[in-house]
């Protein structure tokens, strides 16, 4: 039975209170005993009642309402009558400062009330800070599969009509392409708009998905063996590879091609369709399959066996895809998605590579910023909490020095700062804050300096720089473009991370003239 309380003060503010009606052959007295109130008010219904009439002086007129027999019995009270659906403990009343009048009509349930209690400022849960959302360290330690191929999402219903790609025992492919999220994320480096702490999902919405083997969309393939030796897009090849058509006999030799990985034999930089690309030659490991030559973008990431994510231009890759990478070398074996060595590989390999280098403030690239983030992560893990970030910052202070200590206690550091036209204010948390990134020629010289030093063993570093400068002047604009793009990407990233870098430098240079 349902009772409705009508009052003239607040006719619209009616709250419903569920009563569990005893369906057994018992009186109303037994069923009303299930109602528990924390306050003993005169207006509360008493136990001495019958099914037809209740004589209470302060209780408004009660009218019987016809209800659906399939629904549960409800007892409706005016909002000025204190009541609760379930008994709450005393700490709930103290910690929740949200009044009951703020709840909307008919939308309050037990879970909502618990959520309001848990998220209140006085809640013990909200007083515990597990991590800082603005810290990049949280992003690195989010998922165990940080440097593994992401699992593709379930294929949507709209893609069922398209020909599906073959799924081998090591392959996990999907026609769905993961677009890179907005770079204006709170991470500062990793370009993601949302994060998931679920180890099964990881960062699958941010990592690029491969179309075939380890190659991304936009890659062109050319097989050295087979009837079709022409250049073809990886999308067209994957679509034809997925069609189980007996007429396409030329595709038969490519079934399971490079299942154990593709070994890099050679690489060169060329121009294709007016764009600078990488021309790579791979060996699948079997003589009958033949070699494979591909043309891919400069920032194309590869997952290398026993190394992790790698790229020919790590700075471009981390800006474009948000993937910290090592450098690719001849002999590296690029693994496909789902390969056992790619799944079980230790995720910290890339950061271990960063740890082997001693970066200086001159290395103002995105890779250096990532290495700093990795050191913060290791420091936070060793300290066992958010205090590790302070430990990492203190480590930076020891290496780079604070504004006061660098000028008072170390004249050599101050002289070096003046020589390099630095601003004189070195941040403890960002060692490369006052350093401009390398330009196109510096990137070119950094890549070929070791090679030219080996070619001319009798020449010193200055002579090698002169030779590199002559080589740079003789290069065509198409050949320089790849370095220009990388330098531009580094400059934009540096300006985004440290917008006052150039401004402070001009201010400091002006003060030095006086």
UniProtKB/Swiss-Prot annotation:
It is found in: Nucleus. Pfam families: AXH (PF08517), HMG_box (PF00505). Gene3D superfamilies: High mobility group box domain. SUPFAM superfamilies: AXH domain, HMG-box. Keywords: DNA-binding, Nucleus, Repressor, Transcription, Transcription regulation, Ubl conjugation, Wnt signaling pathway. It comes from the Eukaryota. Residues 434-502 bind DNA. Residues 170-182 have a biased composition (Basic and acidic residues). Ubiquitinated by the CTLH E3 ubiquitin-protein ligase complex, leading to subsequent proteasomal degradation. Binds the second PAH repeat of SIN3A. Binds TCF4. Binds RB1. Transcriptional repressor that binds to the promoter region of target genes. Plays a role in the regulation of the cell cycle and of the Wnt pathway. Binds preferentially to the sequence 5'-TTCATTCATTCA-3'. Binding to the histone H1.0 promoter is enhanced by interaction with RB1. Disrupts the interaction between DNA and TCF4. PANTHER family: HMG BOX-CONTAINING PROTEIN 1 (PTHR15499:SF3). This is HMG box-containing protein 1. The lineage of its organism: Eukaryota, Metazoa, Chordata, Craniata, Vertebrata.
């Amino acid at each position: 039975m349902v009772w409705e309380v009508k009052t003239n003060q607040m006719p619209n503010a009616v709250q419903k209170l569920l009563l569990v009606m005893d369906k057994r052959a018992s009186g109303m007295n037994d069923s009303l005993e299930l109602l528990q109130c924390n306050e003993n008010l005169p207006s509360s219904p008493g136990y001495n009642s019958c099914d037809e009439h209740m004589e209470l002086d302060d209780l408004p007129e009660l009218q019987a309402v016809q209800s659906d027999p399939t629904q549960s019995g409800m007892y409706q009270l005016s909002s000025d009558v204190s009541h609760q659906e379930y008994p709450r403990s005393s700490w709930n009343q103290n910690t929740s400062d949200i009044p009951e009048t703020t709840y909307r009509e008919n939308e309050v349930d037990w879970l909502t009330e618990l959520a309001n209690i848990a998220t209140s400022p006085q809640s013990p849960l909200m007083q515990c800070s597990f991590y800082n959302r603005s810290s990049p360290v949280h992003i690195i330690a989010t998922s165990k599969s940080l440097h593994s191929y992401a699992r593709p999402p379930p294929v949507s219903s709209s893609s069922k009509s398209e020909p599906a790609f073959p799924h081998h025992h090591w392959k996990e492919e999907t026609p769905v392409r993961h677009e890179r999220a907005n770079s204006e994320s709170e991470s500062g480096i990793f370009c993601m708009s949302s994060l998931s702490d679920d180890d099964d999902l990881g960062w699958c919405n941010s990592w690029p998905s491969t179309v075939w083997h380890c190659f991304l969309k936009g890659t062109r393939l050319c097989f050295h063996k087979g009837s079709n030796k022409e250049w073809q897009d990886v999308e067209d090849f994957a679509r034809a590879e997925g069609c189980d058509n007996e007429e396409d006999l030329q595709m038969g030799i490519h079934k399971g091609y490079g299942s154990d990985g593709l070994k890099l034999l050679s690489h060169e930089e060329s121009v294709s369709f007016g764009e600078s690309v990488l021309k790579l030659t791979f060996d699948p490991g079997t003589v009958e399959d033949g070699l494979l030559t591909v043309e891919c973008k400069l920032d194309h990431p590869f997952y290398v066996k026993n190394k992790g994510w790698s790229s020919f231009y790590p700075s471009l890759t981390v800006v474009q895809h948000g993937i910290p990478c090592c450098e690719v070398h001849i002999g590296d074996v690029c693994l496909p998605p789902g390969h056992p060595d790619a799944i079980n590989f230790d995720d910290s390999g890339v950061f271990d590579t960063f740890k082997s280098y001693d970066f200086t403030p001159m290395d103002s690239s995105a890779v250096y910023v990532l290495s700093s983030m990795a050191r913060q992560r290791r420091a936070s893990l060793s300290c066992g909490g958010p205090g590790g970030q302070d430990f990492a910052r203190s480590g930076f202070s020891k290496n780079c020095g604070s504004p006061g200590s660098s000028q008072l206690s170390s004249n050599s550091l101050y002289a070096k700062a003046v020589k390099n036209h630095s601003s004189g204010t070195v941040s403890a948390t960002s060692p490369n804050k006052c350093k401009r990134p390398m330009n196109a020629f510096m990137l070119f010289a950094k890549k070929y300096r070791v090679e030219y030093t080996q070619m001319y063993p009798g020449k010193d570093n200055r002579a090698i720089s002169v030779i590199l400068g002559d080589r740079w002047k003789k290069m065509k604009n198409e050949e320089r473009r790849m370095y220009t793009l990388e330098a531009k990407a580094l400059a934009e990233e540096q300006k985004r991370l440290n917008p006052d870098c150039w401004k402070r430098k001009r201010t400091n240079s002006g003060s030095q003239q006086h």
